[in-house]
């Protein structure tokens, strides 16, 4: 059996553009933090790397990269979403100018790999399905290449607890965890089903409670966001998880207040609303997109066309949860 080689990995989380909805610069100033949320993707990948590899994280939204960071690093990981594209490209060029091999991955490189051709490595798709292949190649001496995970096949029940220890927690308004990937709906404008598929895959209850235990043991308290794109995508699994989550909260005197994203059909399930409230969910982001039924039909937002949206929102309010509404302004006229 080959012995894993030591490797120093510098993970760089790119800056969001200032005009992006993900920036929240003024809100962060008001709340006395540097960023709303921490980089969950990179710290999850960090947990998948060999134990002989050492990881250092720099969130470029909250801190600057130092000469010592580059001198220490054998390899750089970066990548993110579309609003981070410009800074990701800047970081790739910066790494190349310092003679450091750079690995790029994440949603935007997976969707548009040609834009990131300057990176030494592209690791595309969900990390669980490809990271071991990349690590083996690196340790065998490969110094460039494209590694692509099979689509929609990552086994999230094998995903390790993220490396929360890499974060400067005080920099963030809240932290995040992920329960599921994928969404059963087919909204025309959304890339989630292109990245993760239409069959939501969920972690196990012991996995999720292990993540909460890790945060609790670190001393973290307060707002914790389930970053799932549709938390109720797999209701069958969720109904099994929520009572265990509520029990976990109750035995620890409710250390966390949860938020998440869900489709508006959450309002159709009073029992599910009750279970979320019992687990101490206080807020849900709901994509309303448009009040115009014709526009909703055109964007294939079927779940919003079958109801009185205002009444649905008030049902969620009635369960004791705030609703943050998402709208698309200037959608194509079809």
Which residues does each predicted region cover?
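Residue-level marker for beta-strand->alpha-helix junctions and adjacent short loops that shape enzyme
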Residues: 16-17, 83, 109, 129, ...
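Acidic, low-complexity intrinsically disordered segments
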Residues: 2-220
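Catalytic cores of alpha/beta
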Residues: 113-118, 271-273, 333-334
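Short Asp/Glu-rich motifs
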Residues: 67-68, 114-115, 235, 295-296, ...
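Radical SAM [4Fe-4S] cluster-binding motif and immediate context
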Residues: 160-331
């Amino acid at each position: 059996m080959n012995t894993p080689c030591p490797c120093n990995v510098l993970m760089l989380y790119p800056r969001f553009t200032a005009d992006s909805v993900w920036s929240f610069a003024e809100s962060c100033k008001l709340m006395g933090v540097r960023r709303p949320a921490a980089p969950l993707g990179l710290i999850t990948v960090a947990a998948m790397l060999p134990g002989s590899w050492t990881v250092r994280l720099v969130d470029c939204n909250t801190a600057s990269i130092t000469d010592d960071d580059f001198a220490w690093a054998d390899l750089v990981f970066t990548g993110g979403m579309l609003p981070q594209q410009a800074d990701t490209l800047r970081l790739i060029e910066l790494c190349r100018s310092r003679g450091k091999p750079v690995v790029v991955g994440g949603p935007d490189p997976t969707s548009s790999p040609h834009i990131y051709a300057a990176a030494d490595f592209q690791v595309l798709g969900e990390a669980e399905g490809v990271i071991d292949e990349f690590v083996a190649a690196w340790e065998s001496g490969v110094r460039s290449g494209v590694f692509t995970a099979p689509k929609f096949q990552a086994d999230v029940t094998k995903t390790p607890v993220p490396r929360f220890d890499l974060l400067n927690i005080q920099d963030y308004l809240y932290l995040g965890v992920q329960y599921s990937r994928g969404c059963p709906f087919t909204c025309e404008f959304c890339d989630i089903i292109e990245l993760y598929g239409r069959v939501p895959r969920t972690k196990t209850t012991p996995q999720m409670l292990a993540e909460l235990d890790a945060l609790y043991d670190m001393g973290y308290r307060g707002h914790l966001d389930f970053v799932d794109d549709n938390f109720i995508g797999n209701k069958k699994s969720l109904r099994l998880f929520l009572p265990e989550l509520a029990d976990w909260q109750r035995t620890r005197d409710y250390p966390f207040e949860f938020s998440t994203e869900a489709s508006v059909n959450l309002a159709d399930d009073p029992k599910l609303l009750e279970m979320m409230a019992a687990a101490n969910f206080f807020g849900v982001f709901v994509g309303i997109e448009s009040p115009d039924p014709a526009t909703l039909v055109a964007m294939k937002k079927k779940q919003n066309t079958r109801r009185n949206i205002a009444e649905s929102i008030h049902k969620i309010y009635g369960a004791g949860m705030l609703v943050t509404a998402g709208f698309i302004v200037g959608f194509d006229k079809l």
